[in-house]
């Protein structure tokens, strides 16, 4: 009996090793090498044209990719429009603030690709978003990297599926680590991806608690740089519309760089979830390292983005190539 059990275990082990994770195995940088060989150049051109219209395209696209991948995987389900019978992901409260320019650049790139007969209905919206995300990072002077392709578009998008799957502005390191671990991402990946906050903006309503009503002892979060706290109070007075936008990075808001970590060292992290990366002993060494070593940070960011792009990838069995990125076929 023991010998039989051993044979079964060995057989199963061999079977598992012979059939790796198909969702990862299907991804490759030249996935469209035969069907649409110029896909990267076409998407890049659209991205560049869109950025000329508005800088918001850069942070909007980067944030859209993250929000998509963290809810049911990188399958462009965040792009689906709600219908009378289905409230989609994009209409969940956590996604309402996603800027339209991120959606628009994907839609425009899809249109440009479909205008080429050999590419028409061949490239998934999920892959377009992944490519556009790399291109906006590069446009902001961030690192370039090869994008793995071969994702299929998701067949489901519900607002309910967003619940509890996206990090919040008040999360602590333990909460962040658990959330990222669900997607096979490490603490180092979490810190690297958090640095996407070197770009873009947030809304005043997300920081009111840190600058006016932190706790019973302190009105202002004591981990906030005092001068920075006053700047935030001027930008976000108590009576201001909570939707008013403020820069995530007060120093270089239009450039992808490691200044994000230097800001944390000075108490200038906008969200609690940013500043805790420096105040928590588990993550502080990494923050200090990347604050002085941009090469190490860029390398870690590329690794994290590649791993993020593999989360929940759909195959031909549970996905398709959407004709309209905002609607199911």
UniProtKB/Swiss-Prot annotation:
Up-regulation conditions: Up-regulated transiently by a cold treatment.
Binding sites annotated in the UniProt record for substrate: 167
Keyword annotations from UniProtKB, A to Z: Calcium, Disulfide bond, Glycoprotein, Heme, Hydrogen peroxide, Iron, Metal-binding, Oxidoreductase, Peroxidase, Secreted, Signal
Annotated catalysed reactions: 2 a phenolic donor + H2O2 = 2 a phenolic radical donor + 2 H2O
Annotated compartments: Secreted
Record: active site: 67
Positions annotated to bind Ca(2+) 1: 68, 71, 73, 75, 77
Residues making up the signal peptide according to the UniProt record: 1-25
Keyword Oxidoreductase found: yes
Family: Belongs to the peroxidase family. Classical plant (class III) peroxidase subfamily.
Superkingdom: Eukaryota
GO cellular component: extracellular region
UniProt miscellaneous comment: There are 73 peroxidase genes in A.thaliana.
Site (Transition state stabilizer): 63
GO BP annotations, alphabetical order: hydrogen peroxide catabolic process; response to oxidative stress
One annotated GO molecular function: lactoperoxidase activity
Protein name, as recorded: Peroxidase 73
